[in-house]
Amino acid sequence: AGGDTAVRQSHHQSPADRCRADVAACMSTVDSLEQELGELERATEKAAAGGVAASMGATCPKDTTFLHLGDRLEKALISLDEVDTAGEDELRALRKGAVRRIQALIERGDAARARAEAAR
């Protein structure tokens, strides 16, 4: 019954409210992906530093780990593409900021992946 309420409420939302909710949901996913990327970057730095960390078993994240993260970031970008801004500048700016943040995370992921590859 709770799901029915959510569906009914979404029909009563204005396009602007729906857009804000869609962008917020996407950004929530991106927040968790950013945390995951931070963990991968830290693991990469530990392994790249070598020495004590490497002798204690610090290993570089696998290439596939970075690829999966990149795929999920790409999916977040695609979901933002589907968000209808109803032609409102404020909503377009909100979506644009979210897109830029995801693109920056993709670049960070690519850089971390390159560092991990060099450290192997």
Task: List each language-model region with its residue ranges.
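Eukaryotic low-complexity, intrinsically disordered regulatory regions enriched for acidic, serine-
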Residues: 13-120
